């Protein structure tokens, strides 16, 4: 399972959708990047393959970051989206 996490402007919580296959996840990642590079805001409608009832519509100019990562079985629930992890002080 692959997760695409979108960070939106003025929102501290990322929006996530999942894809079962690496190729599908990479294709979605590229389409989001192309929408972000565009000169005009476009409406993106995303669906989730993990939760088929989950649908998200957002404007491309409101996306500030996109992260594609692989979720593996046991680690999937405990991982926080993003690039950095903090370690508790001992």
Swiss-Prot record:
Protein name, UniProt field: UPF0367 protein SYNPCC7002_A0153
UniProt cross-references to NCBIfam families, sorted A to Z: PRK13683.1
InterPro entries reported for this sequence: UPF0367
Family: Belongs to the UPF0367 family.
Highest rank taxon of the organism: Bacteria
């Amino acid at each position: 399972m692959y997760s695409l996490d979108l960070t939106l402007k003025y929102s501290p919580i990322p929006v996530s959708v999942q894809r079962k296959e690496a190729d599908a996840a990479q294709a979605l990642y590229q389409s989001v990047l192309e929408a972000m590079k565009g000169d005009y805001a476009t409406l993106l409608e995303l669906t989730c393959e993990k939760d088929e009832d989950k649908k998200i519509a957002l404007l491309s100019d409101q996306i500030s970051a996109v992260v594609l990562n692989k979720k593996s079985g046991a680690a999937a629930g405990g991982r926080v989206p993003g690039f950095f992890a903090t370690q508790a002080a001992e």
